[in-house]
Amino acid sequence: MKKIEAWLSKKGLKNKRTLIVVIAFVLFIIFLFLLLNSNSEDSGNITITENAELRTGPNAAYPVIYKVEKGDHFKKIGKVGKWIEVEDTSSNEKGWIAGWHTNLDIVADNTKEKNPLQGKTIVLDPGHGGSDQGASSNTKYKSLEKDYTLKTAKELQRTLEKEGATVKMTRTDDTYVSLENRDIKGDAYLSIHNDALESSNANGMTVYWYHDNQRALADTLDATIQKKGLLSNRGSRQENYQVLRQTKVPAVLLELGYISNPTDETMIKDQLHRQILEQAIVDGLKIYFSA
């Protein structure tokens, strides 16, 4: 104790009031340092330091909203892990950016992020086939549902396999397969169809589910297709279809446009439009398996 008092006397701090002032000043300096040091992390604004992408969620599996460039500025509104939720103040568009592409002190992930579809088994069920032609159009093209469900499924199969998924098809050619024999197990089951009504006015796409464990997949695919597709959106709905009822795995029935509607038929026939829909489905599956 005497040594402490001697040191205080030497420094001219023997007076208790002076000591309190010094301690308060030191604590203020420490607080100010901590505040300034955390400012870059908690700042309301961030700057992009290298070209990157604005995504719909905090993961590289989420779809890209648009490209961002070095020097762009955003308002920071949230953070999950190393991903920053931002808002474009000019357009009010919200999205997520990997923190290491910003001026924030966030170290990049050096490990390659695993593709969420890697190792997953996806069952594709092209509706109808053979003697069961499904719906048909009333235009000069006389398009048949069974043909375009198969085209879509085959194109989607190639895209999914490139992503590392294993794909099982309930049919690969123009043959009839009973509903009972379409019950194939996998991590996800997609039954692909085109809708039709007597009236040519009905249009758009619908995602159907039946069991409760199928709804999350249906809602996710509905959101990603709505984001990218040109078809009007009729939402995600519960329906008692046999292909959904007889399987217990996450399954959906996709009605990708009304073949009885001339505008929808044009999009169903167009390969580029199908590819956009197919990529939206892949994006949705990635998000679903990343959750």
From Swiss-Prot:
Domain SH3b: 41-105
Main location: secreted
EC number of the protein: 3.5.1.-
Entry's localization field: Secreted
Gene Ontology BP terms: cell wall organization; FtsZ-dependent cytokinesis; peptidoglycan catabolic process
Domain of life (superkingdom): Bacteria
MurNAc-LAA domain location: 122-286
CDD domains associated with the record: MurNAc-LAA (cd02696)
GO molecular function list: N-acetylmuramoyl-L-alanine amidase activity
Keywords: Cell wall biogenesis/degradation, Hydrolase, Secreted, Signal
The protein's enzyme class: hydrolase
GO CC annotations, alphabetized: extracellular region; outer membrane-bounded periplasmic space
Signal sequence range: 1-40
Region (Disordered): 118-140
SUPFAM superfamilies: Zn-dependent exopeptidases
Tagged with keyword Kinase: no
Function comment: Probably involved in cell-wall metabolism. May have autolysin activity.
PANTHER family named among the record's database cross-references: CELL WALL AMIDASE LYTH-RELATED, N-ACETYLMURAMOYL-L-ALANINE AMIDASE
Family designation: Belongs to the N-acetylmuramoyl-L-alanine amidase 3 family.
Protein name per the record: Probable cell wall amidase LytH
UniProt source species: Staphylococcus aureus (strain NCTC 8325 / PS 47)
